[in-house]
Amino acid sequence: EVGAATGTFNITVIALNDAPTIAINTGVTLTESGSVSITALMLNEGDPDDEAAGLTYTVTSAPVKGQLELTTGSGVAIANFTQDDIDNSRVIYVHDGSESLEDSFVFSLADGGEDEVGAATGTFNITVIALNDVPTLSGAGDTLSFTENGGATAIDGDLSVTDVDDTDLESATITISSGYVSSEDVLGFTDTSSITGSWNASTGVITLSGTDTKANYETALESVTYNNTSENPNTSALTITWVINDGDGNSSSVTSTVSVSAVNDVPILGNAGDVLAFTENDRATVIDQNLSVMDVDDANLELATITISSGYVSSEDLLGFSTQNGISGSWNSGAGVMTLSGSSSKADYETALESVTYDNTAEDPNTIARTITWVINDGTVNSSTVTSTINVIAVNDAPTIAPSAGGTVKESETFVITSLKLQAIDPDDVPAGLIYTVTSAPVKGQLELTTAVGVIITNFTQEDVDNSRVIYVHDGS
């Protein structure tokens, strides 16, 4: 009945390094152009004998549509990281914004003591959720130099349309975003088979709409024109703002510039053409009371000329004007021109022109028609000429006889009646047309002509007198 002997047998276990394994590899999903943290729920090791900081991932094939970074080194691509980096959300994937919907990287995982055991390897898959990329409009910035009356002109011929995820565009807006004057500024577009234009004059916006290729929209945008319909345009610079749309979003805006240069418009003188019937010995008479003065880009006129351009007779024709409203007149009788000068309103010049008079100082006026030519000037340029007409009507003037003391003759002799003794005056008749009629004949002699001696006459002309053909013959009593 002796008890059994007992003892303890000790076994010593020599530890071996366990190679790491990949316990979790789910991949990750993010949106286009975004970034995402790679966490331990997505990528994790299975190594019972190593700390996370001792487990190193080595990227053997890097992602091609983005890059791996550490939050502690933003923007710097990495090729190595630890499980500790993952556990603390320090590893991120940053997408490059391209249109690819997937990416990946290949890695190996080692703890540094595999005892000739190969490192674990794997591929981490990245899924990209696509987002719409807004179209891009570039190449703007041209300055169109538009001159008044220049007609519709293309604004910018250097535009460029791109969209990385669309082949077509759906619409575009072109806006006069600065300097717009609705009464004069106009944008224009000629419709194509797919793109139509609509101009809103109240807002200064032209809208292009219709599905068409980016290339066709680029051509359409480069054909949009600017025009200014005013004869006195506002010369403030205009800003043209361009925006395109792919059906899902607008591009950023770009701008061009339109500079407008005004051109002096000639003044216009209208409604001339009156015909003045001027009768000899009339007083100075207004020539034309229906004139009209216009100038779209000037409030004042500076000068006017009124010319007797046809039929002028310097010895008798006279134009007259009375100074008024800062306008004075100067008559040049050598040229037959009345010049009005002085800066004054168009209305004042119209009144002044309608007060210009014609007079004829002759008692035997030339009756050829006179043409009156009118011109106004705004300080820079003359208007076109307009004309009125003056018809001069002569009136027969009655002759007069200059006082005469008569003559002296000796008894039974002959006395020659000369123009020194008898002179008829008539401004509109020649001497041969002035006929003397004897209404009471001499009683102590008789009147005769030297061309018919002995024949009593009762009529003779001033021409007979001027040529000493009229004689008085005394009868000797």
For the regions a language model picked out, list residue spans one by one.
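Extracellular glycosylation-rich, acidic/polar low-complexity regions of adhesion-
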Residues: E1-S477
